[in-house]
Amino acid sequence: MAVISMKQLLEAGVHFGHQTRRWNPKMAKYIFTERNGIHVIDLQQTVKLADQAYEFIRDAAANEAVILFVGTKKQAAEAVKDEAIRAGQYFINHRWLGGTLTNWGTIQKRIARLKEINRMEEDGTFEVLPKKEVALLNKQRARLEKFLGGIADMPRIPDVMFVVDPHKEQIAVKEAKKLGIPVVAMVDTNTDPDDIDVIIPANDDAIRAVKLITAKMADAIIEGNQGEDSVAAVEAELAAEPASTESIEELVEVVEGK
């Protein structure tokens, strides 16, 4: 059984790509058709490739991989944070700081500073400092937390990176490739897929689409860590859905009201 059904993908709007004039020709094989100037992603391929991504992430988690979720656009920020936390992994959901992976030593120093400020508050140091200095420390902490809070406890450079919109996260993807870190990503029709190791053709601009795919990747991690029973509820939900015999042509017509 597919980890994500065609019905779920359709309802989340995963099939809507970008305007045809904004496409990347390298995504041609993942495009089903064009409707009203918009590319329609081939959901049959998305179903198959989402399965492959799920298995890849699950197997990595089973081998105790450190997995980093990356998505800094507003449509992805909440899902990336929530699902990474649910899976017991790490995330960056605001601006990617150049060198986050390739200059990990410097990033660790900034994380150490964040933890130092937290300790200062916990041990009572704040109480004996001037209010102006405490205000400056809080301002510094807020900035560090915003950009590095999601990786503050990450023990090492990640073994796998899951990315929402690698077109936007090009710097992150380049750093991962430089270090040989495999990248699993939601790839829309405007993106060059060449640097992505495990591609999930999908609309990366719709909040529901991002939530659906990101949640399934988190499910994969949970299953890899705890075994199949941990995602039994998800599978039961899918099993309860009536089997669909509709073709992608029929599904596209349904969503467009034809």
From Swiss-Prot:
It comes from Streptococcus suis (strain 05ZYH33). The keyword Isomerase does not apply. Keywords: Ribonucleoprotein, Ribosomal protein. This is Small ribosomal subunit protein uS2. Belongs to the universal ribosomal protein uS2 family. One of its GO terms (cellular component) is cytosolic small ribosomal subunit. One of its GO terms (molecular function) is structural constituent of ribosome. The gene is rpsB. NCBIfam families: rpsB_bact (TIGR01011).
